[in-house]
Structures are given as structure tokens and as C-alpha cells.
Design a protein with these regions (language model features):
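Hydrophobic anchor at the beta1->P-loop junction of P-loop NTPases
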Residues: 36
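Short glycine-rich substrate-engagement loop in P-loop NTPases that contacts/grips substrate
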Residues: 60-92
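Structural recognition of the conserved hydrophobic beta-strand(s) that form the central parallel beta-sheet
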Residues: 94, 119-125, 145
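A cross-kingdom feature that marks ATP-driven nucleic-acid transaction machinery
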Residues: 1-14, 27, 54, 277, ...
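Accessory nucleic acid-recognition modules appended to NTPase machines
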Residues: 200-343
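Walker A (P-loop) phosphate-binding loop of P-loop NTPases
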Residues: 40-41
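Interdomain motor-coupling "hinge/lid" segment immediately C-terminal to the ATP-binding subdomain
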Residues: 2, 8, 125, 131-240, ...
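Conserved lysine of the Walker
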Residues: 44-45
Length: 396
């Protein structure tokens, strides 16, 4: 136990978290079992250590961070370790990469039943279905998703500002006033393209080639997260990677040709749809459906999950419009439902709001529809039903 406590103190003391993630405010920390899911490289470890640093003194033995990558846990279960920690006065156990432990869900259930005064916060892959696939945790675990940096968090990090998030309703009703609070302090256009290119994943702060780092992370998502958690044989990995690349290469302008994709990777249509779902769970893809439809039906659009992925896979041929629409869907995806639009709009949000994403210069030769919200790029200001696209990056 002493060795784990020493490691905990060292990690908490040296954690580098220059921006406080908004999820920290959204979690009800009074719950006894909290699961934090997120894609690889999104900052889950830093988030746990940041929580420990905020809530506990560094020498407080009531809180302990452990990582299931530690070889110690190849011969010791979570419940036994938690019991020893509890009997030594421990009350908050932070478990990183919980899925690396066999029978992790039943072990967590045992902890929950045996130690009513012990709080457990654990992290896992976005591919995990915490409640659907682990019935023993149903009703007792509170699940949250840690996302990549929003444009707001990115700007706060680079400029030292502390801009707050806004709801979609606030932005639509009061965007002209909100913009007046932001523009005197920062020029969003100076940072927006950088964010689109490399601002979503926290490791952009590291002094390494970002695209290479992201490609390695994407490979780990498919090789470890999807194969390990979904228990897929290694021989199918090349099919999943080839499918992902073909979808990325084709872009999102038309619905995927599932029959052609199945032929190209030599598998069935049903398997293609399953692979697409796994890639979506891994936060590599977003599926866009017409209103009233959902998986397992064929989506109307398959998009990359965030714009950074576009530049990592196909940097020379990224179309500006595709990058902007990818940003739009990704930033709204957290709290809103996005469906394909009609003739006069790109997307329907929450079943009622019509959005069109376009270059501000296109507005000069268009008839403005009063029931459409125009999210414009290449501008910092808005008026009426025309809002600057970058401001949607302040939703979280």
C-alpha cells in the first residue's frame, strides 16, 4: 500500500492540467460509483489526478489513484485491494483503465456492496457499454463522457482567459451580446483554424509531431480498444482499418455504399454495419440519420468524429466545408441530437432547429430564410439568425 501511496503523491504533485475541464462541474461527486469514459488520448488520467489535487491534500491517505496497467493487479483483484485500502482509512479510490482487469464489473459491484463508505471513480474506454453490457452495475453507476477540448477550452488554454460555456439557447437568443464580451479580449479567428487542425486532443501541447501522435492514438483505438473490449480476433483488424480509411477517403457528402464497402473488405453488409458502430463507439466516426431513424439502419452520412482526424488521415485534400461541418456536428453532439436536414438546411438539431453551415461570403448572393439558423465561418460577428460558427465551440 505504501508504494501505491508514494506513486499517488508523485503523480498528483506533478500533474499538468493548465485548463480545468468543464466535466469537473457536471459530475455529481456525491455518487458512490462514477464511471468516466473517453477515447484514448483525451486526458482521462489527468482528469482523475486533477480531481485528487483539487479535493484532497497531497498527503491525505483517504484518496488513492491506481492504474490497472500495474502488474500487481495481474495477481490481485480490485475488491481485495479496495478492502485493504478501506481498512487503512481510505475513502476515495480512483481506478484508471478499469477494463484491463478481468471481471472488473463484478469486482466493482463487490466493492459497492461491501464498503458503503467507499467512493470509486474509474475510467474506461469510450467503446465500453457500462450499463448495457454489465447488468450488475445497472442502477448504481453514474456514467459520464470526457470529451476532447472544446474551442472555448482551447482558447482559454492559449490565451489565459476564463471564458465560460453557454447553452445553445443562450447563443441563439443572445449571440450578439455574448460576442461583445469575447471580442475585446481575443480574436477567435486567430485560433479557430488551429483548433480545427490540432486542438481537440490535449496532447497537442506536447513537443512532438501532432499528426504522427494522433495516428498512433488512432491505431491504438482500433488495436486495443475495439479488439480487446469487443473481443474481436486480431485477423479482422486489417478489415476494420481498411473500412475506416475508405469511409474517411470518401467523405460525408453522400450515404455510405454498404454493399461496396462489404465487397471491398470481403465481409458481409451486417459485419460492415457492426464495424461502423464499433468505430463510432471509439469516437472515430459520427453517424448522422434522418429524423426518426437510427442504428442498425444505414446512416444518411458517416463523418469523422472531429476535424483533427481529417487532417491526420488525408491532410492535403481536406475540404473547408467538410471540416466546418465536422466541427459543427462534433461540438453539438455532446448535448444535442443532430439529424440530416432538408433542401434548405444541412442539419436538424433536436428535431426542430434548422441549421445551415456556410462561408460568410456565400451570404451575399443568397435569400435569407427566417426559419433557418446560418452558422457562418470566416467571420467573427453575427446578427439575427446568422451566428458565427466558432461561437458554437463555447457550448462546453
Amino acid at each position: 500500500m505504501e508504494a501505491f501511496l508514494r506513486t499517488h503523491r508523485y503523480l498528483v504533485e506533478h500533474v499538468n492540467a493548465p485548463v480545468r475541464r468543464n466535466l469537473m462541474n457536471e459530475i455529481n461527486w456525491n455518487d458512490r460509483l462514477i464511471g468516466i469514459k473517453g477515447t484514448r488520448g483525451i486526458g482521462k488520467t489527468t482528469f482523475l489526478l486533477q480531481y485528487a489535487k483539487e479535493k484532497f491534500d497531497i498527503s491525505d491517505r483517504q484518496c488513492l489513484y491506481i492504474n490497472m496497467n500495474n502488474f500487481y493487479f495481474q495477481g490481485h483483484g480490485i475488491a481485495d485491494f479496495a478492502g485493504e485500502f478501506y481498512h487503512h482509512g481510505g475513502r476515495t479510490l480512483l481506478i484508471d483503465q478499469v477494463f484491463k482487469q478481468p471481471d472488473w464489473s463484478s469486482e466493482l459491484r463487490k466493492c459497492y456492496d461491501l464498503y458503503p463508505n467507499l467512493k470509486i471513480v474509474f475510467t474506461g474506454s469510450s467503446v465500453m457499454r457500462l450499463k448495457d453490457e454489465n447488468p450488475e452495475l445497472n442502477g448504481i453507476v453514474k456514467s459520464y463522457n470526457l470529451r476532447g477540448f472544446s474551442f472555448r477550452e482551447f482558447i482559454n488554454l492559449l490565451t489565459g482567459n476564463d471564458f465560460r460555456p453557454y447553452t445553445l439557447e443562450e447563443i441563439l437568443e443572445d449571440h450578439e451580446h455574448i460576442i461583445k464580451q469575447i471580442l475585446p479580449k481575443v480574436s477567435p479567428n486567430r485560433y479557430f483554424q488551429d483548433y480545427i487542425h490540432h486542438g481537440f486532443y490535449p496532447f497537442f501541447q506536447e513537443h512532438r509531431n501532432y499528426s504522427e501522435n494522433l495516428l498512433k492514438t488512432m491505431n491504438m483505438m482500433t488495436e486495443v480498444d475495439i479488439l480487446l473490449i469487443k473481443q474481436i480476433e486480431l485477423k479482422y483488424l486489417t478489415k476494420i482499418k481498411k473500412l475506416f480509411y475508405q469511409i474517411a477517403e470518401e467523405g460525408s457528402k453522400k450515404a455510405p455504399n454498404v454493399s461496396k464497402l462489404a465487397h471491398d473488405i470481403e465481409t458481409s453488409r451486417a459485419t460492415v454495419m457492426n464495424y461502423i458502430k464499433y468505430l463510432t463507439d471509439a469516437r472515430l466516426l459520427n453517424l448522422i440519420y434522418p429524423i426518426g431513424e437510427e442504428f442498425p439502419k444505414k446512416p444518411a452520412k458517416v463523418m469523422l468524429h472531429n476535424s483533427n482526424l481529417l487532417y491526420a488521415i488525408y491532410p492535403i485534400q481536406v475540404e473547408k466545408q467538410e471540416a466546418m461541418e465536422t466541427f459543427f456536428v462534433n461540438t453539438l453532439w455532446k448535448d444535442h441530437k443532430v439529424n440530416t436536414g432538408y433542401r434548405d438546411c444541412n442539419y436538424i438539431v433536436d428535431g426542430k432547429m434548422k441549421f445551415r453551415i456556410l462561408d460568410t461570403h456565400q451570404m451575399q448572393r443568397m435569400k435569407i430564410q427566417p426559419d433557418v439558423i446560418y452558422a457562418r465561418y470566416n467571420t467573427e460577428i453575427g446578427r439575427g439568425n446568422q451566428i458565427p460558427l466558432w461561437l458554437l465551440g463555447f457550448l462546453y
